[in-house]
Amino acid sequence: MEFPIVNIGREHVDRFVNEIAPLVCNEYIKRMTHGEHVIYPSTCIAQAALESGWNVNAKTLFGIKGDGFVSDTTEYIDGTYINIQDSFKCYPNVATAIQGFYDLMQNERYRAATKAVDWVEECKEMYNCGYATDPNYSDKIINITETNNLTVFNDYCLAILRGEVSAEETDNSGRVEELADKLENGDYGNGRDTRAERAAQDGYTLEEYEAAQLIVNERS
């Protein structure tokens, strides 16, 4: 059973999902194995897409409030959408942003969401728990999930946890970091096409190459 690849036909969507999905699934499986409170991968990915505008390079992938940087945002207050400035946490890379999201889910505030019976109820509870003020928030992340077939990642992770497929097939974070180091060191040259081709010759997938290139960009 191969790791799912989303191919919706919209380049920015496909790239976003396929770059962060392996990292989200790794974190989900790890947290489930340790008995922690979790949110389905599909919901995590959908929230990241909505909060960042499908921008994997966004300073705040999940729109988590906290010390970091100040940015314009829209909040729904007293029945009205209001543009304000607020402070958001900033993470050094996608992997740590995902870890930060799942760390946040350990808060008792989100217990109704992490105990939801399915991903649809989970999306509804994310709004009820106060993750966002937009009354349409749940509908938006449900729509993103359904439109882009994100539940395939839930199925894959649950298959691993049931022992139906080896976790080694999705635990590629070490390979991605290794490839990022090689790219940064110039082991595969400077041309993008050349680097991708040489990485493929060494057995790396295109998804691993794209994820590694993202890490390199974040380091610079």
Regions found by a protein language model. Name each.
Residues 48, 130, 145, 199-202, ...:
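A general structural motif at alpha-helix termini
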Residues 1-170:
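Catalytic cores of secreted/periplasmic lytic hydrolases that degrade extracellular macromolecules
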Residues 120-127, 181, 191, 197:
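Surface-exposed aromatic
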Residues 126, 174-178, 214-220:
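Extracellular glycan-binding segments that recognize GlcNAc-based cell-wall polysaccharides
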Residues 173-175, 184-196, 204-206:
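Extracytoplasmic Gram-positive cell-surface binding/anchoring modules and repeats
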Residues 152-155, 200-220:
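Repeat-associated, polar segments at repeat-unit boundaries in modular proteins
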Residues 7, 167-174, 178-179, 185:
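Acidic, Ser/Thr/Pro/Gly-enriched interdomain connector segments
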